[in-house]
Amino acid sequence: MSYKLDVKAQYIKDLSFENPNSPQIFVMMSKATPEINISVNVSSISLPVKTDDQKSGTENLSSLYEVTLQVNAEARIQNTVAFICEIKYCGVFSIKSDAENNEIDLSHQEVKDMLLVAAPSILFPFVRELIARATSSSGFPPLMLDIVDFRTMYENQLKQGVGQNDNDNSVDNV
């Protein structure tokens, strides 16, 4: 049996762009290349929703999950902040089965894998484009984030013993 993530919605939950040292920073940029630090965090929460089964007339508890991809980028030139960009981009997902009854028979670890690896991989291109647009609209060259390997990020945290608590549905990469 195979499973897939079904995207129900995606949206910007929080977006902040600060350009605290303009216009001086643009003069500094003409003489030096900024140092850019980026951090990435993925988290998920369960959103239980009651649904009516039209065929049997019964109520079922169907789980939706909100996955948040948070990216923080800070650029500095000679210890002066050029810009700070912070975004929390979310998606609401459900897990679908190819079985006729759509019964989900996944372990907790398999669900975490889908939510912390597959889901952020779906969200990342949108975050990347939003950050590039925000930086270029603020007078800087567009910041094109490198592709993030969410599988490796997740596996590294498992090796370090982080996120092994059943209630911890997050992954960090700094």
Curated annotation (Swiss-Prot):
One of its GO terms (biological process) is protein folding. One of its GO terms (molecular function) is unfolded protein binding. Its main location: cytoplasm. Keywords: Chaperone, Cytoplasm, Protein transport, Translocation, Transport. One of the proteins required for the normal export of preproteins out of the cell cytoplasm. It is a molecular chaperone that binds to a subset of precursor proteins, maintaining them in a translocation-competent state. It also specifically binds to its receptor SecA. HAMAP family: SecB. Homotetramer, a dimer of dimers. One homotetramer interacts with 1 SecA dimer. Belongs to the SecB family. This is Protein-export protein SecB.
